[in-house]
């Protein structure tokens, strides 16, 4: 069973943090999987896919220059982003809360192009 939680990212955001809190109905670790898609769409084979950790993590972060393993760092563009949660325990209900934190800050500076220098003997 897939559940999608869309949220709006305004201009000026440099990091997204997502934490999943599970209630007392949890059967075993890893029965709730997490992933995220950016403003380009929430299709698994589409350009908006930014990461998936399955049930290996209960939280992740995506920033412009760093991200939790399993997720892609890069510019945090404004628009509608989507966290997807999948239950791998059929017929079982679990209380859960999703906390999404958006961090504002200055954009990462782009690296200036490097000039090639030839060494001569």
Q: Predicted segment positions?
A:
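A composition-driven signal for long, intrinsically disordered, charge-rich low-complexity tracts
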Residues: 18-20, 46-47, 118-121
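Low-complexity, Pro/Ser/Thr- and charge-rich linker/hinge segments at domain boundaries
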Residues: 102-120
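Short, small-residue-biased leader/transition segments that mark boundaries at the very start
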Residues: 1-2
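Hydrophobic beta-strand segments within beta-rich accessory/binding domains
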Residues: 5-26, 72, 81-86
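Surface-exposed beta-strand/loop patches in noncatalytic accessory domains
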Residues: 21-68, 78, 88-95, 100, ...
């Amino acid at each position: 069973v897939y559940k999608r939680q869309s949220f709006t990212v305004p201009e000026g955001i440099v990091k997204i943090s997502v934490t999943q809190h599970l209630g007392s109905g949890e059967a075993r670790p890893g029965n709730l999987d997490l992933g995220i898609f950016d403003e380009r769409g929430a299709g698994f084979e589409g350009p908006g896919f930014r990461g998936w950790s399955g049930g290996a993590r209960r939280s992740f972060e995506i920033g412009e220059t760093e991200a939790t393993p399993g997720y892609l760092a890069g510019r945090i563009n404004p628009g509608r982003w989507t966290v997807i949660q999948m239950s791998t325990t059929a017929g079982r209900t679990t209380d859960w809360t999703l906390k999404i934190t958006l961090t504002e800050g200055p954009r990462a500076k782009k690296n200036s192009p490097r000039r090639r220098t030839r060494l001569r003997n």
